[in-house]
């Protein structure tokens, strides 16, 4: 699989989100989501998973990719909230 130069990897995103969690910028959606707690994050994950399913059924591949990217973002925010590392997840793959 070939990547373009502008691609953000799963690892890049996790590092970026971890940095936001540590530095807590005032205008950060990630910080607000973390402050909302696991229950709110779980609800958001369910919403995003539903949007992925609907996009797979009714939308273009580009729209589906966008929805999947949002699901991955929220999954990583939940991981950070619970203190999971990428290696914790990779060991289960």
From Swiss-Prot:
Q: What class of enzyme is it?
A: hydrolase
Listed as disulfide-bonded, the cysteine pairs are: none
**Which Pfam family, giving just one, matches this sequence?**
PRA-PH
What keywords were assigned to this record? Amino-acid biosynthesis, ATP-binding, Cytoplasm, Histidine biosynthesis, Hydrolase, Nucleotide-binding
Per the record, the pathway is: Amino-acid biosynthesis; L-histidine biosynthesis; L-histidine from 5-phospho-alpha-D-ribose 1-diphosphate: step 2/9
Its localization reads: Cytoplasm
| MF terms (GO), sorted A to Z | ATP binding; magnesium ion binding; phosphoribosyl-ATP diphosphatase activity
Q: Name one GO cellular component term.
A: cytoplasm
Could you tell me the Gene Ontology terms of the biological process aspect for this record?
Answer: L-histidine biosynthetic process; response to host iron concentration
Q: Which reaction(s) are listed as its catalytic activity?
A: 1-(5-phospho-beta-D-ribosyl)-ATP + H2O = 1-(5-phospho-beta-D-ribosyl)-5'-AMP + diphosphate + H(+)
InterPro entries recorded: HisE, PRib-ATP_PPHydrolase-like
Q: What is its EC number?
A: 3.6.1.31
Keyword Metal-binding appears in the UniProt entry: no
Sorted alphabetically, which PANTHER family does this protein's record hold?
Answer: HISTIDINE BIOSYNTHESIS BIFUNCTIONAL PROTEIN, HISTIDINE BIOSYNTHESIS BIFUNCTIONAL PROTEIN HIS7
Q: Into which family does the record put it?
A: Belongs to the PRA-PH family.
This chain belongs to the protein called: Phosphoribosyl-ATP pyrophosphatase
